[in-house]
């Protein structure tokens, strides 16, 4: 049975607030501002533009999630080809069980020294939530805030609790509902 979590109207408003520190500026400014921090910790990127720009400043994310779209338009980022590639389906406005399982699997591979790229068929916009939930403490998770900059999340117990609360507040849908 397929199961997924769907974003509610109330949560949409909450998620407009960044889950971490918003680093403002036009590209590549935000990435250059956080580069020193990124070089000291494991990094997870969410989004095509974020992944491409982190790679451009010489930082290799342990896990990169993207959907080959930006602002709902097709996008072909320049990405590395030495990583393990996984694919998963995740419709817009949802977090599927398949996405949760794939992110968990990716962290298992990353623990063994592999860099992992996850190509999301659908949308990866909410993927920072499972990334934070499964990431080891101290990991940095980055996602884009369109037309504003990049959000830098330092994974802490408090941050994990906030993401778990968001996931628990989402509407649970089972195949056929």
UniProtKB/Swiss-Prot annotation:
Subunit comment: Monomer in solution.
- Residues that bind GTP, according to the entry? 25, 31, 48-50, 67, 69, 124, 147
Q: What is the activity's pH dependence per the UniProt entry?
A: Optimum pH is 8.0.
Effect of substituting residue 52 to A: No change in activity
Q: Which UniProt keywords apply?
A: Coenzyme A biosynthesis, GTP-binding, Kinase, Nucleotide-binding, Transferase
First-level EC class: transferase
Protein name stated in the entry:
GTP-dependent dephospho-CoA kinase
PANTHER family hit by this protein: GTP-DEPENDENT DEPHOSPHO-COA KINASE (PTHR40732:SF1), UPF0218 PROTEIN TK1697 (PTHR40732)
Knockout mutant characteristics: Disruption of the gene results in CoA auxotrophy.
Quick one: effect of changing residue 123 to A?
Strong decrease in activity
The family classification in the record reads: Belongs to the GTP-dependent DPCK family.
